[in-house]
Amino acid sequence: MALRSLIADARRLVVKVGSSLVTDDGRGLDQAAIARWAAQIAALRAAGKEVVLVSSGAIAEGMQRLGWTRRPKEIHELQAAAAVGQMGLAQVYESEFARHGIRTAQVLLTHGDLADRERYLNARSTLLTLLGLGVVPIINENDTVVTDEIKFGDNDTLGALVTNLIEGDALIILTDQRGLYTADPRKHPDARFVDEAQAGAPELEAMAGGAGSSIGKGGMLTKIVAAKRAAKSGAHTVIASGREADVLARLAGGEAIGTQLRAPTGRMAARKQWMIDHLQLRGRVVLDAGAVDKLTAGGKSLLPIGVTEVQGEFARGEVISCVDTAGREVARGLTNYSAAEARLIARKASSEIEAVLGYVSAAELVHRDNLVLL
């Protein structure tokens, strides 16, 4: 089945709109533009689709309300701008969707919400309940309280995480560019447009450039990585220009617009997807070549004897990274032992665990049922 048919038939969509598409060149929110997005999403809703909107714009709106002309560099100033701007962003979306008889809900997420399994499931339940009630959730990172999200995060990644969270059928990333090119077309006039590719293809990241403006955070690379992440749950991604007239309606109608990134066939198990979606891990273990081979080729559990080094501090039950001696991540899994315990039993046979610790929680450091290969 062609990708555009899958987009057309998708029941649950996640739409991410960038700062440049909802602000007046960074000078606060562009209410007319937001009105157009509300109208397009209302049309999708009328066609029977569920839509979750991931919207940038809070910091830009906060800057305008505070009279700032340049994006500040200090984290506390960015947090202040986000706090002020989030009020305006929610108000404008609420009023514009109300014109179409649609209620909206503001949902602010942090990495911690998605890293903790219980909070992850609660967030999923809330979002699915909102969709069932006919509400359009409008999601943003909680920039006001989480410094890492402002400093390192972006809403492209958040869009992919939300797609996986709700098991969306497709992620649509709208930007001020036509889509993906083999090079930055603003610097390389001979750059070729990429209309279709497989999400996660190594050559895609090599094509991507840096951030495009001082207002937003996400460059094309973040969109490529977001598509790769969304593909793990079986969701396709479209990167398209939000300047195209009625772009959402046309995509939903099956028209091939922008760069369409196909997801490989199949959907990863929900718990394994949750492990992959951890952006920040508190620890990792270095494996010898034999352990790497048994994990990747043999489908075996990770035993303490295959661990050469334990890095970071983590508790039992946390997600940890498993890397080879070159530092390449090969797997992630739920550990049966804390970092302190793992250091004591590293390079030891499972039969020696009780003699070392005085007890045995499990014969494996990570059981294969709690392990996901990367």
UniProtKB/Swiss-Prot annotation:
Annotated ATP binding sites:
K16, T175, D176
Residues where substrate binds: S56, D143, N155
Pathway the protein acts in = Amino-acid biosynthesis; L-proline biosynthesis; L-glutamate 5-semialdehyde from L-glutamate: step 1/2
Which top EC class applies here? transferase
User: A Pfam family for this UniProt protein?
Assistant: AA_kinase
What's a single GO MF annotation on this record?
ATP binding
Where does the record say this protein resides? Cytoplasm
Which InterPro entries does the UniProt entry name for this protein? AceGlu_kinase-like_sf, Asp/Glu/Uridylate_kinase, G5K_ProB, Glu/AcGlu_kinase, Glu_5kinase, Glu_5kinase/COase_Synthase, Glutamate_5-kinase_CS, PUA
Q: Which domain of life is it from?
A: Bacteria
Query: What task does this protein carry out?
Result: Catalyzes the transfer of a phosphate group to glutamate to form L-glutamate 5-phosphate.
Protein name according to UniProt: Glutamate 5-kinase
Per the UniProt entry, what species is this protein from, by scientific name?
Ralstonia nicotianae (strain ATCC BAA-1114 / GMI1000)
